[in-house]
A protein has these predicted regions:
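Bacterial N-terminal signal peptides that target proteins for export
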Residues: 2-12
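Hydrophobic alpha-helical segments with strong N-terminal bias
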Residues: 5, 94, 128-129
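N-terminal secretory/targeting leader peptides
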Residues: 12-14, 26-115, 132-133, 138-334
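Sec/Tat signal peptide C-region and signal peptidase I cleavage site
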Residues: 19-25
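Hinge/lid segment of periplasmic solute-binding proteins
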Residues: 119-136
Length: 334
């Protein structure tokens, strides 16, 4: 064989190897609610990029934003079944009360404790891992949206005073027993109202306020009818990176670690950003003429103390005694 032929043969062999590698590259579909170009969609794309780079192209994560693969509750079922590989979205909590831990009031009160508890080794991450394992799902990380609060169409008298009885009716979501009991202990009246009716309900005075989201969410949906925003820090809103467990198990241990590390890197980066993002949303509210009420750490601890000692015993059934015990143990509460 001439030198020229040897070069050609070598080139063909290398090309064949590359093509073989490409042929065995695996594409995983990841669904998210986030709109194209949003911070959440960018986080999903960064996760995809990290996985692609670190697996040297063995795994490609294709991101489908804006519920392109279906409503998020449908996608949740599809990930369980393996029809969709991955998602970055809320957890569907209806069929397992342990997952109420993701919005349980005052499971944490600040960004540092939320990050610790929502990362591998943390109490809430562990509880969620155990709960969704039964459904064929594995959690990889959490994309933080921010701390929760309540928006009102009216002024709120002394919102830190949990002994004051107010003539304000706050909407809680259907099934939102946890926050119904919390708000009533904090001196508010409550009413259940479907999401589709909430804007009109606040506008017409059927209810005076709403709870269950972040300042950013309130700006998106209720900016023009919100007069007061109270940053209760009652829960931490986040989307979960989840993957079908069988699909995850089919990957090599090295690639499993790459996916987990990439999700955790994106999650950690977001935890560094989310406090500033919340602060920015609060500033936007102030600029729009909305009265913004925030609390110092001592006041938040006092609110959390009331919730944990007086509200938690009433809503323990929403979580289950064993799961509540795990949460209390992680917080050093007897």
């Amino acid at each position: 064989m001439t030198q020229s032929n040897r070069k050609i043969a070598t080139l063909l062999a290398v090309t064949a190897l590359l093509l073989a590698g490409a042929a065995h590259a695996e594409t995983l579909r990841l669904s998210t609610l986030k709109q194209p170009g949003s911070e959440g969609a960018q986080a999903a794309e960064k996760f995809s990029k990290l996985v692609g780079e670190r697996t040297e192209g063995r795994i490609e994560i294709k991101v489908y934003p804006a519920c392109q693969l279906g409503d998020w509750t449908e996608v949740y079922e599809q990930v369980m079944q393996g029809a969709v590989d991955m998602a970055m979205q809320p957890l569907a909590t209806a069929d397992d009360k342990r997952l109420a831990i993701t919005w349980f009031p005052y499971a944490f009160t600040n960004y540092a404790t939320a990050k610790q508890s929502l990362s591998p080794g943390g109490a809430v991450f562990g509880i969620v891992s155990e709960a969704i394992a039964d459904k064929g799902l594995t959690p990889l990380g959490v994309y933080g949206e921010g701390m929760g609060g309540a928006g009102f169409a009216k002024a709120v008298e002394s919102p830190a005073n949990t002994e004051l009885k107010r003539k304000l009716k706050v909407r809680v979501w259907p099934g939102g027993t946890t926050h119904k009991v919390l708000l009533e202990r904090f001196g508010f009246n409550t009413a259940t109202l479907p999401w589709a009716e909430l804007y009109t309900g606040m506008q017409t005075g059927v209810v005076d306020g709403q709870i269950g989201g972040t300042a950013g969410m309130a700006l998106e949906s209720f900016k023009d009818i919100t007069k007061t925003w109270v940053q209760f820090n009652d829960h931490f809103e986040g989307d979960w990176f989840i993957i079908n467990s069988d699909k995850y198990a089919s990957l090599s241990e090295a690639d499993q670690k790459i996916l987990l590390d990439a999700a955790q890197e994106v999650s950690a980066e977001r935890f560094e950003q989310v406090e500033a993002a919340d602060a920015k949303h609060l500033d936007t509210m102030r600029q729009a003429g909305i009265e913004v009420v925030t609390f110092d750490d001592a006041t938040l601890d006092k609110l959390a103390g009331v919730a944990r000692t007086e509200v938690w015993p009433q809503i323990a059934g929403e979580l289950g005694e064993e799961t509540l015990g795990q949460l209390k143990s992680s917080l050093g509460i007897n």
